[in-house]
Regions:
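Metal-dependent catalytic neighborhoods of phosphoester/phosphodiester hydrolases
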Residues: 1-15, 94-98, 131-139
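Active-site-proximal segments of metal-dependent phosphoesterases and phosphodiesterases across multiple
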Residues: 48-50, 76-119
Length: 164
């Protein structure tokens, strides 16, 4: 934060946190694939690569983040995997946010990448601080918005426990 991202990463890694940025890891037989994800909207409202170059660059970033997630998931050889994102892959977990900002909260491209893999048993994301706790990808994978402002009111604590 505040231009100190590298320092934050260094501190977290020195404390034993595994940074998933565009890669995967396995803990106790469960695979975790991470990507930031990106924005662009959901379903029929998803922004397409047309018109001005700036829009095409924007859409390319959303496509690239979905590819990074897909590659991280593909690298896992586990029966159970969790996709870890910042941005939402479905509109259901951003419900509660103003409709006008939905396109800036996530992208369906992420859900399409997730649904390519049968071993993905859950997805977690943040970013939508006023969103809903849970939903499913079109392929049926459970999605959880674990933003603190969503989780704490739901559970009375600033974290959720998921059984994978």
């Amino acid at each position: 934060e505040a231009g100190q991202a590298d320092e934050v990463v260094r501190i977290l890694q020195s404390a034993g946190v595994i940074m998933l940025g565009e890669q995967a890891t396995v803990i106790d037989g469960v695979g975790f694939a991470g990507a930031k994800g990106f924005i662009g909207g959901f379903g029929r409202g998803e922004l397409g690569a047309f018109g001005e170059d700036a829009i095409k660059v924007f859409v390319d970033e959303a496509r690239n983040e979905a590819r990074l997630l897909e590659n991280a998931l593909r690298s896992l050889r586990t029966e159970r995997a969790v996709a870890v994102l910042h941005y939402a892959p479905i509109p259901e977990t951003v419900e509660g946010e103003p409709l006008e900002i939905y396109p800036f909260l996530g992208s369906s491209r992420l859900a399409h990448a997730i649904d390519r893999f049968d071993n993905v048993k859950a997805v977690v994301h943040g970013h939508a601080h006023r969103g809903a706790y849970s939903g499913h990808t079109p392929g049926g994978v459970p999605v959880f918005n674990v933003a603190q402002f969503v989780v704490e009111p739901a559970f009375g604590r600033p974290y959720a426990l998921l059984e994978i």
